[in-house]
């Protein structure tokens, strides 16, 4: 049966279910009719979950602590009859408020309840249907979850008067999830003390095991964090993250922004606080929704299944909370669930919240160092039982506390402190736990309760048990059957010794059973109907199998837990020490050699376990020798491997890391945080780097390591420089890669690689300092659809920004340059252009002037440029023909080859841009100033219209005009003596800045005028610019010469092409 499910589980018909064991000796007839065959299979409608170890792998460090958690889930603390009244419903409204007599069994933190009247109705053996009805009633218990419950005892000072007029005494007030509240009343003081001790102990063991689980979780998962050493240092900065929080179990979750503030004082009583805000905008303390000002305990909540360990992020904080700044703090259980982040493991998220929270409240040794000692009450691992012991304390160990009058007014935290004091005194005497068990067939049993937990008993003792299903039964059984319970069969000599023990059979009366509606009218059953122990002559006792670890009266855990009066004598109890186990004795003097032999069948493998400290045979358990340390571990813990790693580095900043740093990174190579330097430093893996000893896993990791090394060794040079496609597509000159030498070292597997190259290509297109492609093209070149036609045979070549204009470019003698083919995106691989031009000085020295024919001896290449490719002027240039533009009937020079780059965009230099059709009037010019105000800033756009001619510098009118140095020829003979025309990108939009009017004779700038562009040929070659003399004030403006851009402007003597 599932613990937290609200559905009632119904057993099958009696034909398929031979019988059930009695919950208690609830009458002689009732107990005899609920005999159970322990070897029979019990089938339920609910599927029985298999062992988590068989379904999913669990870290070896967590196996012992999970075993203890499941042992606590199945522990049978106490059972008996009492009255219960539900006061409030889950929504806070009044319930029926009627007393009901129930029979209860406390299993772990689950209180199972049956209606005592219904059970009593089917005790008549003469009724043929009573057995069937009894099984149906017994299979439908009501559960109350006490995991997060709050207990309060009532006494005469509370003055709670019932309807009968009497005070409510011997009662407990239990507040559970949401707003549910129950009143439990017991028949006498002894019953009240027993139940109070059992419930207090189960809550203490639950919280202690959760803290121990947190320590094991941090130990096993925290080592996977690459920055765990930094995380565990004593730091003072605040931690902020989005969380979901709820105040009390069952309350709704609310999303808020948590800020963990560290304490500025090192004093013991000064703590930080956790402020919870509704959003991350207002994070001042006066805007806090709630503030956790103190914490008594803080731990990660075990998710009840090993499969959910790495995905659960729930944290429980037991402390004081303030909802208003001026009000006093309230004791609350706060549940915090940090939000998961993308591509971040859940254990990474929860650990990064746990450590700062422990630091701010100075819990468990933080912020200095996490405590790992079992003897320290402030440690996460305090009092943890040493396997094969599975429990912290017995129920009767708490009877002195419940008998004390002062305990009636203790809070939950005070109860925890007093229980810790008892445990600490016992540990000082060599106490290692209680209730050893040897019939473990699986280290991780099912965490769910079944019929065996509710009804089965062994030897009439209500001792805690663990229902472990064997692997064979769980594999062969169907989904609707529980695992078969296996028992240890002792030899005849051992059985005879146990049966002939001198321990007397004690008969005790149970508390009075209330069978009337009024709680003060009671009926006491007969002596024969209530007995906590059955005599040896009883026929029911002969059917039971004695336990392997039998105990005397003073050593049994729960046979006195039933409501009876037994004086508590702590001197009669002897601590079970490891020395007695080594001699084969328990505290009651029984020889356990036969029992220890049964442990050989246990399928439990725990690295560096210290089972050998408690057993005579050291080979009882298989221990991984690869992960064991050379030094012998002490017996102060059952999680030896965890404690050693938990107490040493990197979990303490005062000690160094165990082993080399490379081994640590190799062992946890799947860490969530790793720097690139640390990743590259991992060269190889060795079998000693892994502690699990799994050869198959080592082989897989070795294969992944070799693959990673091959990927890291793979660079750009294996793709760009030596590929066959490069040899086919053409050779590259040394000049082409002068600025790209660093690209060979790029990592192709970098996710930002393509984005970086695209940005670089964009920068090349608009970079004024980049190289400008110039090409040698034929004069008879046809229109390409770009609005440009060739005019003259002009030789152009690549120009680099880092070279001076007097330096001759170097070319590779092995690979002659063919820039026409390099820039052509449609060139087929393996085909070269039919050109025979050479790079001799005679070919490049002669620059054709305007109207000058091309030398007949010069050979030109037959380059064909594709149409309408990356055309920035496609809108205005699509209708151009070979006859030329309407404004310029002459043919123009074609553009150079496409600029190299990832986007293969044409070079912005020397590309003619056709004016807008509506520009029928002369364009206004800028006021005189520096036309190249952008300087060497390549990404700055031009500050003037593409067709606006910049004005000369007024401060130096006689200085030769020095245009932008980007288009300066590289000093080739016969090249340009001055500089090329200014850079005008083809795809720059029209200037949106307000344009100044034409300068008038009376204006301050009237003595300046635009340059006539007389010495600036249209085809791109220019000499030194000679600024004209300043114009006189009284003289008439000279007519502009019909040269340059002015020849396209309409005037009285020029025919307007758009006027037709």
Curated annotation (Swiss-Prot):
Q: What is its main location?
A: cytoplasm
Biased composition (Polar residues) is annotated at 490-504, 845-883, 900-923, 931-945, 1048-1060
Q: Which residues form the PH domain?
A: 75-204
A single Gene Ontology CC annotation of this entry is: nucleus
Residue span of the signal peptide, if any? Answer: none
Q: Where is the composition biased (Basic and acidic residues)?
A: 571-588, 801-814
Please provide the record's keywords in A-Z order.
Activator, Cytoplasm, Nucleus, Phosphoprotein, Repressor, Transcription, Transcription regulation
Q: Which domain of life is it from?
A: Eukaryota
Low complexity composition-biased segments: 465-481, 718-731
User: One Pfam family of this protein, by short name?
Assistant: PH_26
What are the boundaries of the region Disordered? 1-29, 465-588, 718-742, 801-1060
Q: Where in the cell is it found?
A: Cytoplasm; Nucleus; Bud neck
- Provide the coiled-coil residue spans: none
- Where are the Phosphoserine residues found in this chain? 491, 510, 518, 538, 556, 871, 885
Family membership noted in the UniProt record: Belongs to the CAF120 family.
Quaternary organization: Subunit of the 1.0 MDa CCR4-NOT core complex that contains CCR4, CAF1, CAF120, NOT1, NOT2, NOT3, NOT4, NOT5, CAF40 and CAF130. In the complex interacts with NOT1. The core complex probably is part of a less characterized 1.9 MDa CCR4-NOT complex.
The entry's function note states: Acts as a component of the CCR4-NOT core complex, which in the nucleus seems to be a general transcription factor, and in the cytoplasm the major mRNA deadenylase involved in mRNA turnover. The NOT protein subcomplex negatively regulates the basal and activated transcription of many genes. Preferentially affects TC-type TATA element-dependent transcription. Could directly or indirectly inhibit component(s) of the general transcription machinery.
The protein's name: CCR4-NOT transcriptional complex subunit CAF120
- What species is given as this protein's source? Saccharomyces cerevisiae (strain YJM789)
User: Which gene is transcribed and translated to give this protein?
Assistant: CAF120
